[in-house]
Amino acid sequence: MAATVYQRLHSVAVGVGSAAGSAIGSGSASLPGSGTGSGSGIGHAGNTSSSTSSALLSHSQLTRSLERILEEAHFSGELILTNRKLKDFPRTGTKYSLTDTVIADLSRNRFAELPEEVTTFAFLETLLLYHNTIRSIPESVKQLSSLTYLDLRSNQLSSLPREICFLPLQVLLVSNNRLTSLPDELGRLDQTLTDLDASYNQLANLPARLGELRSLRSLSLRSNHLLYLPRELTCLSLISLDVSNNKIASLPLEIRHMSTLVELQLENNPLTSPPASLCMRGLVHVFKFLETQATKDEKGSRSGGNYDGYTTLRRAPRHNSSGNVLEASTTGSTNNQRRHQVDSGYNTSDGLDKRWSHDAPTKSKTDSPLHCVSNSTAATLPRTLPSAVHSQADLMDASLTSSTSTIVDESLTLSPTASPCKLSYAHSNSSSNGSSPDQDDDIMLDHQERTVHHANGRSGKGLGNIQTYKEYKEALKQQRNQEISVYKQKHPNANHSPNDDEDLSPSPPSISNGSSSNTLPKSIMKQNSNQIGHNGNGNGSANGNGVDDVVIPKKPIQKVIPSRITEIKPASTSDIRSANSSDCLGYVKPQSPMKNGTSKFNTSNGGGVQTTVGIVSSTTIKSPVSSTTKLGTVKTHRSVTWNHDIPAEKLSFTMRREFDRQREETELMSQLRTIIETRLKMTLPVDIASALTDGVILCHLANYVRPRSVASIHVPSPGVNKLTMARCRRNVDNFLEACRRIGVDENLICCAADVLEGKGAVQVAITVGELFRLHGNGGCGSGNSSGAATPTKSPTRTTRATMSPTPLA
């Protein structure tokens, strides 16, 4: 009986073994765990127990499943070979065709490289290869022209081939590998790639072209060796950014402009800017910190460029098609866009554009819609000066009415082949009938900051450096110490008529630095079309009935006040043919004196600057102009009457007022420092304005004058040593309100921006000085507390009037 059962089991085992052998021989002989000797192995199992035969049955079932999977992939286009411990791709032979496979899942196997068979799937869109031992990817991967999803997580890749960057990938997952860098060609995926996961690698830096991935929305760089984030990264439109578990110490300030960012992971980084404690609060707090830091850096860059707290930075000049520099303020309506501010923070001119720093804008007159001189007129300029002195023409249209005048900086570009033209300027001051103008001498300007480089027969114009406010103050000191006069006046020629041609030889300039080139600053006064006709009604003629009234500044410094000019000397030039064409009149802004400059001209206040001032030609105006004609200013609602009765000794009034203002500012800042350090028993840094921006010290000062005048003061916490902008504003508002309640005059109270922006330290000093003056008069504090504040009233009002942006009469 037992022998019969044994024979039956043996026959079943042999049958199974032969079936398995035939299945393997049909195309699966290379699969791991199977072989051609399976039949003999099963035959040997006939001598074992029944449990061995059941294991062989399960292995036979697995073999059938692999064949079934290949068959399903042949019909459906989905190849699922996950978790089969495969080291090689199964050979399908000619029985199954997988070239039209769309999805291939080869994850959780033992592939050492991407199988070559997979790279032949031209229609493959999704390829999953995670949890393998892949060390390399063949170059043939570029044949997968339809691949959009590639998962290479948890492999052993040390680098990615550049061919991957030529695929239309939308999702690229390469986390948990050994990558030390990403391919530089990653920017080629800018149109398609939306998700990039390179976490848990060994990346020390990121490719520069990463910022070109404009379609990228999710970027994970967790657990790498990154020391910083490149600025190119901030150009992306990311929604999620994960840079946690790296070595990043600071974030780029530009990251605050990533408006699309929703999720930002920064934990486990040695961050100092922003602090790690602040990063835990969320994205909004990080962006606020970076915004504040950027504002402070901008202020620091201004101070590093020798700009004081009142300096107004100007736009960089832009170039037109002809290569000339165009001032940004000359575009559009010049009446509305003319700037009235000056760099020192106050304005003492009567609307004319006189600034501490000269931008020296140059502009082709043919490109300007406001220019009234034709090319034929400009061609008549004589070229008689020697080639050692290169000058640029200042052209100015005389203005009769203040409501229609404007000033445009402009220069005359000389032809490269033409020799430099001789510029002789005529000062015309017509009488009531416009028939007897006088004549004055020409004055040459040796400009120390703008030169014209001449080489190989070509002359080029160089843009001078911007003269800062500090340099201007140094120039004033030099001018005060020098005893050389600036101008020399000649007797007028009463027999000169506006249309006479008379040669006036300019005085030779003294070039201290040995330069063979010289450039003159440009300024053109334009007149509105309703005052001067351009089509015949206002053109100049030989027998015109009027001449222009042109005022030439007689001061060697930049700030020129028309009412301080003593007299106006008319003159004309013979070098300009203006009989049948309308020309423009111009003047040159005086510049700061040079250290070694010498002059042949004398005036009462002295100085070392040489100035060339004059008029190219005169334009005929219909109505006669008297010597007291009001010239138009930039502000159309103001008019200025020229005063010719001021004595010459008062010409230095502006300079004296400048010194007085500087002295008063120094006294006010010293007084502010003394008040704070003596009352609050603390030491202030050199930059007082930055120490007052949070308003804490000012609130304590208000409470010192009147206890509990500021009920609550926001102070920085130990973890975060700086207040938010909202709390700083609240402190400053509380201080200003306390000043009003104590009785400080509203006109002497600074505004919140003076404190928060750190630009109005003088206004803050005025407010604090007035506060303690009231404190001393009221007897609220100690007797000696008002000692430093008593002299505040007079200089305070004087300084505020001087600092006012409205022009002084």
Curated annotation (Swiss-Prot):
Its main location: cytoplasm. Disruption phenotype: Embryos homozygous for a null allele of the gene are viable and do not display gross developmental defects, developing to adult stage, albeit with a slightly decreased viability. Homozygous females are sterile, laying rare embryos that display no sign of development. Mutant flies display increased lethality at extreme temperatures. Pfam families: CH, LRR_1, LRR_8. SMART domains: CH, LRR_BAC, LRR_TYP. Residues 351-368 have a biased composition (Basic and acidic residues). GO terms for biological process: cytoskeleton organization; intracellular signal transduction. Residues 27-53, 295-373, 423-442, 490-550, 783-809 are annotated as: Disordered. This is Leucine-rich repeat and calponin homology domain-containing protein. The gene is Lrch. It comes from Drosophila melanogaster.
